Swiss-Prot record:
InterPro entries: Fmt, Formyl_trans_C, Formyl_transf_N, Formyl_transf_N_sf, Formyl_transferase-like_C_sf, Met-tRNA-FMT_C, Met-tRNA-FMT_N
GO cellular component assignments: cytosol
Protein name per the record: Methionyl-tRNA formyltransferase
This protein's record includes keyword ATP-binding: no
Alphabetical keyword list: Protein biosynthesis, Transferase
Family per record: Belongs to the Fmt family.
Organism of derivation: Clavibacter michiganensis subsp. michiganensis (strain NCPPB 382)
Broad enzyme group: transferase
Entry binding sites for (6S)-5,6,7,8-tetrahydrofolate: S108, L109, L110, P111
Amino acid sequence: MRLVFAGTPRAAVPSLVRLHASGHEVALVVTRADAPTGRKRQLTPSPVAREAEGLGIPTLRTNRLDEEATARIAAVGAGLGVIVAYGGLVREPLLSTPARGWINLHFSLLPRWRGAAPVQRSIMAGETVTGASVFRLERGMDTGPVFAVEERPTGAHETAGDVLHALAMQGADLLVRTVDGIAAGSAVARPQEGEPTLAPKTSIADGRIDWARPADAVLAQIRGVTPEPGAFTSVDDVRVKVHRAAELRDAAPLDPGRIESVGGAVMVGTTSHPVELIQVQPAGKKPMPAADWWRGVTTRDITAR
């Protein structure tokens, strides 16, 4: 079947690769326009754009799915549109442009976590199971009927980046099987069931650690915003990113935010047991072991805020 693929970030690349290697033809790739990255703010193609170029697939780089983009997509004559984290909404008349409409690979167990940050919000909420869903795109945000779902347990130490990478691989296979079923006429989409939850895009504010919560909630927050937007706290008015942390269930309690070093472990108090800081990054410096950072802190009676 002739396809149009729309996607932008690294998480969408496995799906593009698997579809290209299948018996289907990816006739056009739609991705976001080149964006400034790095300290020099150089315009850089998206991961999907780079992969499409390597595969020899024509690309449409645009941030607006307007009339011009719709005409370009319609000219391809695709039977089906496939979206994986493109980064924009598909509206009419583009929604009806491919003969069989559009399907979307979403990294959650719909209807849970509809929105831009399903993996991050699932981890931040303390959930231990997530997954991938392939559904038919319609006007509502992630509300369409579902063709296929696969669950995946979330490891106790996995970050959002870890889980998203795993789901990108698992979801790519699920997506190809769904496209196969649609082409064969055997795929069936069923309405979503259950209470929906929303997963709005994470912001820098989501990364500020609130130590006045139990340790498991603090660790879930850190894992959920790693690598982006990143967890952080303020120590002596200096922002310190927290890349890795762990539970210390047997340690003596500390007041929320209180920092102490015991036996080489740098601990921060919560409303339950302390959390051990393993890897941190003070503002303007590279990531380092928390013990190395602590040796450079001159004030010992301090609180993380």
